[in-house]
Amino acid sequence: MARATPGMSGADLANLVNEAALFAVRRGSKQVERIDFENARDRVVMGARRESLVLSAEEKRATAIHEGGHAILTVVLPNSDPLHKVTILPRGMALGVTWSLPEERHTYSKEYFDDMICRAMGGRVAEKIVFGHLNSGAANDLEQATSIARRMVRELSLIHISEPTRPY
């Protein structure tokens, strides 16, 4: 559980324990079990399941292809964190989620960030390969990749941008 909750504060962990207790009560159990903690962690980290959201078969397929693209790259990229879970059940504001568990490290290589950008774009690439076009569902992935690249340039100096040469 500790590995699946990196960066959580004491208050975040207390909230997670309370959520786990609620899941146990809903199951009719007097004991909080591992499954309750896993469900609570998913709810806290990925958002509540949106069971009322009904997707068409086409939307479900597109979401599966998209999340599959993220998952494949998470597994094959050499500097990627290990894949933990993939779901096409809508959670929070997302139609699907691919979740990796970050390994504990104190420094990150340029290659690690490069792979993060590739993973973020994996859903878009999968959609383009399978459907031949993109849809609006990947907008957050583009924002994430842009944010990582911007951080690599502005804060970490991992990419050097030179002035464009002028012909005059």
Question: What role is predicted for each listed range?
Answer:
Residues 1-12:
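A short helix-loop-helix "switch/interaction" segment in the helical subdomain of ASCE P-loop NTPases
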Residues 11-158, 162:
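Conserved P-loop NTPase/AAA+ ATPase motor core
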Residues 163-168:
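Short "domain-exit" segments at the C-terminal end of structured domains
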